[in-house]
Amino acid sequence: MEIINVFLFLIILFLVKDFVKKNKKIHTKSPSGPIAFPILGNVVQIRFWELFKIQEHELFGGYSKKYNGVVRAWFGERLFFFVSNYDVVKYFQKDENFHNRPSVLVPGWRYASSNGLGVMSSSDDKWKRAKSSVSQSLRVRTTKKLMEEKAIEFIDSLEKISNNNEIFYPKGHIQGYACSMLFKYMFNQDLSVESGMSRTIGNAVEHVFGNLSKLTAFDCFEIFSPLYDWFFTRRLKGCDIVRQIISSQNENHLKSIDPSKPRDLMDDLLIEYGLNEITKEDTMQINQICFDIFGPAVGTVTITMNWVILQLCNRPELQEIAYQEIKKAVKDDEYVNLNHKQNAPYIVAFIKETMRLCSNGFGLPRTAKNDQICGDFFIPKDAIIFINYLEISQNEEIFKNAKEFNPTRYLDESLPVPNIHFGVGQRACPGRFVAIDKMFLGISNLLLKYKLKTQNGEKIDDSIQFSVSLKAKDYGIKLEKRI
């Protein structure tokens, strides 16, 4: 009996100590947060509110308002900060102290990033070299013609659906459009927008996005570390599907590359990393850079275009404004090209407004190299920080009438709005301008050829589904050919 009492005492002591550790402030300006329970921390609140259909982005939106835009949260034994205070975010934009990704990554991210490689999850010199390589390739390689050709192929592939009065399900077709364009740029390989490979890759990326956004015990407790690879190999199968494709392309390029005539991004990376002197780690880095590009180039573009089409259907009066602008810009041309973009600012504004209200979530984590005071808040060294872009986008002090869907807010230069659609500061997406062009071509050509209608005349459900990028529920629409 005495042993049991001692055992119970030790358990209680541990729980009290853990509770104090999780809730005690280490600095007078330490951010506050909801009560963190022993062992599980704030996972308790997440799971509790899930019972009432409250998703993570909604829960942390409420916490953001309560705790002045910087929320402390414990997930098991891991400490996070969710930041929507824009004055604090400005420090992340400008200060090199916040340019790195966490060295102790959440295990799911660790697995998806090959333990902190690539252009999205690496830090310091590794990241700077990867970013420079990708940026240089984007500058050298002219993607204008490629994007315009793929946009035409995308639109032409919808002819059969329209002629047969079939329901158009945008997501799969957008995945094909994004994948086929990326394959040509990255591997110099032609891939039809309707190919099975495009759908396979698109589904794999969606699978990774969805599962990375869901907390598991393996993400929260170091004790499970021996089982990480076993668990995430099964949970993140989409990673391995994409990695196998990239690895095969890497091997084929090594056999056929002509250093004097690089064909694509893979050639550019192989040359940058030394070609015949490439180490195993270099190969992993090259492959991870390509993997990282698949995420935003396929996943984020698909999610955003899917949202844009939904908003155009639900707002026919705004769809008509966008169509008239496109029609006027193209004049007698059969398709929209990038030369028309300067005369079609409304559709670009429509895309940005959709991203602001719908698809921007928490982004990727960053960390603090050293302790730092950011305005009214103390951010400790090695903190894992997520920027809550959705909450920033709904802040009335930053965006006037923030809850209102109003693309024209991006057309008034006298009222500047933050450009947070692709991240902030040095860690913003290096391919953001290409992504906007790709979406502009796809959406504007779709509008030029078809009037987009809901199936039954009622609005499509626009409730947000939590993911790495916030996504819409799957839906179908009618395509009415314009005369």
UniProtKB/Swiss-Prot annotation:
Its EC number is 1.14.-.-. GO terms for cellular component: membrane. Its cofactor is heme. SUPFAM superfamilies: Cytochrome P450. It is a single-pass membrane protein. Belongs to the cytochrome P450 family. This is Probable cytochrome P450 517A1. The lineage of its organism: Eukaryota, Amoebozoa, Evosea, Eumycetozoa, Dictyostelia. The gene is cyp517A1.
